[in-house]
Regions:
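Beta-strand signatures of extracellular beta-sandwich domains
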Residues: 72-74
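Beta-strand cores of secreted/periplasmic/IMS beta-sandwich domains, seen most often
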Residues: 49-68, 94-110
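C-terminal motif of bacterial Sec signal peptides marking the signal peptidase cleavage site
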Residues: 20-23
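Bacterial N-terminal signal peptides that target proteins for export
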Residues: 1-13
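Mature extracytoplasmic or organellar-lumen-exposed domains after removal of signal/transit peptides
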Residues: 125-373
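N-terminal edge beta-strand
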Residues: 33-54, 154
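Bacterial signal peptide processing site
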Residues: 25-27
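Extracellular/periplasmic metallocenter environments
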Residues: 38-41, 88-130
Length: 373
């Protein structure tokens, strides 16, 4: 999963789009003077799994050297994901950039025989100068986060009540609306590693005895046709989204993290919405798709003034690409929602994927522009 880092004074730039992992976020777009570090994904995990670097901007260049067991590299500070590249199947490569302070970090390549390594960063780094435009972007996006977590709680309350009451049809009707606000802010929500698996894990993401949240209820509603045994799950889900609402109010943000989140929301579309994996029982994937795109656009809008100062033509292209994606989605609307994902043809999904790829290619340039001195 993709996550916006939450560590103070950290700058992060990353791309993890499955559909275009080898093409976006190249190291040529990295901040000037960045240290470039190359890693391979193998059956063993990250190679090398012990590395050193000076404090400051670092570009992580990651390539899958032929393994199906390991498809991502994460840099962790404790249990917090600072940056990652994911969905790298055999032959694909990707990059992400971080500005790291002195300290010891974990290199995590899940699935390898030796999953964890160490990155030691030495020396000092200068604190970022105050930037009124960046501060305005942070304030704007924080308001968006708080608005959507409020909507998430408000939509989850009646959904959970319907599940607890055993009203299958009402719960089915309310399910898509409860998903929307979470999907809009997914990278920030995922940064809270304890909460996200409880709220949004899919059946194959966690051990069977840890499977909770939206998708466990989704399976019960659409596969089993009952809410039997789901009351504790619904109560737990409601408690977790309320905890997320509280945590979002104090999350630390940087402007570049917001820009990175815009990219990572498109990565969510490529990795799980275009494939139909996310809502595999209800098939309301296009609801999630639109919410991810809306969240990406909101994050971009927050940092747009910063980007416009340096590349106004890029801003115009990104705005046009967002409109193209919405236009492609519009052709699949039905009533107040969308057709089931299973009704899409191969040509339909190809058109949607191409729109996301075109948008992501342009949007991936934004974080590097923001961190330029």
């Amino acid at each position: 999963m993709s996550r916006i880092p939450v560590r103070p004074a950290l700058l992060a730039v990353g791309v993890g789009l499955a559909a275009i992992a080898s093409g976006c976020g190249s190291s040529d777009d990295a901040p000037a003077g960045a240290k470039r570090m190359s890693f391979e994904l193998t059956d063993a995990g990250c190679v090398p799994n012990k590395a050193k670097a000076p404090a400051g901007p670092i570009v992580f260049e990651v390539e899958n050297s032929g393994t199906s067991k390991v498809t991502e590299l994460e840099v962790l500070d404790g249990e917090t994901i600072l940056g990652e590249v994911e969905n790298l199947s055999d032959g694909l490569s990707g990059t992400f950039s971080l500005t790291l302070e002195q300290g010891e970090y974990t290199l995590y390549c899940p699935g390898g025989s030796d999953e964890r390594g160490t990155l030691t960063v030495s020396g000092g780094s200068k604190a970022a100068a105050s930037n009124p435009a960046a501060e305005a972007a942070i304030a704007d996006y924080r308001s968006y986060l708080e608005q959507n977590t409020g909507e998430l709680v408000a939509a989850t309350e009646p959904f959970a009540a319907a599940v607890i009451a055993g009203d299958v049809e009402r719960a089915k009707r309310l399910y898509p609306a409860a998903r929307v606000p979470y999907e809009r802010i997914e990278p920030v929500a995922e940064s809270f590693g304890d909460l996200d698996p409880r709220i949004d894990a899919r059946e194959n993401d966690v051990p069977a005895d840890e499977f909770e949240g939206f998708h466990k209820i989704e399976r019960a509603l659409w596969v089993d046709g009952t809410t039997a045994g789901m009351a504790p799950v619904a109560r737990g889900l409601l408690a977790d989204v309320k905890e997320l609402q509280r945590k979002v109010k104090t999350v630390d943000l940087e402007a570049v993290q917001i820009a990175n989140g815009a990219n990572e929301l498109l990565g969510e579309v490529s990795a799980s919405k275009i494939t139909g994996e996310e809502e595999r029982y209800s098939h309301v994937d296009l609801v999630d798709f639109e919410a991810n795109v809306e969240g990406s656009e909101a994050a971009f809008d927050a940092v747009k003034p910063l980007v416009k100062e340096r590349d106004p033509e890029l801003v115009e292209q990104i705005e046009a690409d967002f409109e193209a994606v919405y236009k492609a989605l519009d052709s699949h609307r039905r009533g107040n929602g969308f057709v089931a994902y299973t009704e899409l043809s191969e040509a339909d999904t190809r058109e949607l994927a191409q729109g996301i790829d075109a948008l992501a290619e342009q949007l991936s340039q934004v974080p590097a522009l923001i961190v330029q001195p």
